[in-house]
Amino acid sequence: MIKKILVAVDGSENSFRALRFALDLAEKYAASVLIVNILQFPVIYTNPNDQLVYSGSRDAFIKDLQRIHEETLAKAADEARRLKPSVEVAAELKEGEPAAQIVETAKRGGFDVIVVGHRGLGRLSEVFLGGVSERVAHLAKCAVVIVK
């Protein structure tokens, strides 16, 4: 039986399709939904002169990045509550490598299903880079739905 659904959003249209799918599933099974957005801090490389490539301060960059992720999460939560007011919805911002954080959140929270969007990388990119959805499907111990 499905009681707890974890859905990851990144602001892309595919992730919002995944959100809508998760909400439909939650409504059908009277399940709750946790929406997560994963903030992965990028490596800021330095050049040989030891100057940051990013022209602003590192703190300002991180603050902007965090704000963008918080806005994405708030938009997803608002959309979920608007579309399915009867579904219990919570939202959390996590930090780290996306696939690992999604899987760990599902494990710790005892989630029955993880729903993620398909990124839609080209075939060659998928071979070399893989994707978050593929890594989640590989690592997760619960059911994973990848929405196209």
Language model regions located:
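Small/aliphatic-rich secondary-structure junction motif
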Residues: 3-56, 84, 88
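A short acidic, glycine-rich active-site loop
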Residues: 55-71
